[in-house]
From Swiss-Prot:
GO terms for biological process: vesicle-mediated transport. Residues 1-98 are cytoplasmic. This protein may play a role in packaging, transport or release of neurotransmitters. It comes from Tetronarce californica (Pacific electric ray). The lineage of its organism: Eukaryota, Metazoa, Chordata, Craniata, Vertebrata. It holds the Pfam family Synaptobrevin. This is Synaptobrevin.
């Protein structure tokens, strides 16, 4: 009896020993090249997405900075308005007090004149 052949059978994948294995009829490394190209395409797609996201983050940061500046300016304007409104309120309160004192004085003079006119 003879010993069985030590290498793979001639009809097995890859054919003769020492040759790369792969699907029948496919050139060697085609599938690995295809996988590598797919992976590289995915990496490029992810890199593009990351670039877009970074651009969006930078744009958002710029808009937030501008919004913060506008909010600070608005806060300063509100503080200035509040102080000028308080000054204006005091001014017209004193003006109103002066008017009431003048009306009270005129009323008192009229009452005194009436009293003097009727009792003399």
């Amino acid at each position: 009896m003879s010993a069985p052949p030590s290498g793979p059978a001639p009809d097995a994948q890859g054919g003769a020993p020492g040759q790369p294995t792969g699907p029948p009829g496919a050139p060697p490394n085609t599938t690995s090249n295809r996988r590598l190209q797919q992976t590289q395409a995915q990496v490029e797609e992810v890199v593009d997405i990351i670039r877009v996201n970074v651009d969006k983050v930078l744009e958002r940061d710029q808009k937030l900075s501008e919004l913060d500046d506008r909010a600070d300016a608005l806060q300063a304007g509100a503080s200035q308005f509040e102080s000028s409104a308080a000054k204006l309120k005091r001014k017209y309160w004193w003006k109103n007090c002066k008017m009431m004192i003048m009306l009270g004085g005129i009323g008192a003079i009229i009452v005194i004149v009436i009293i003097i006119y009727f009792f003399t």
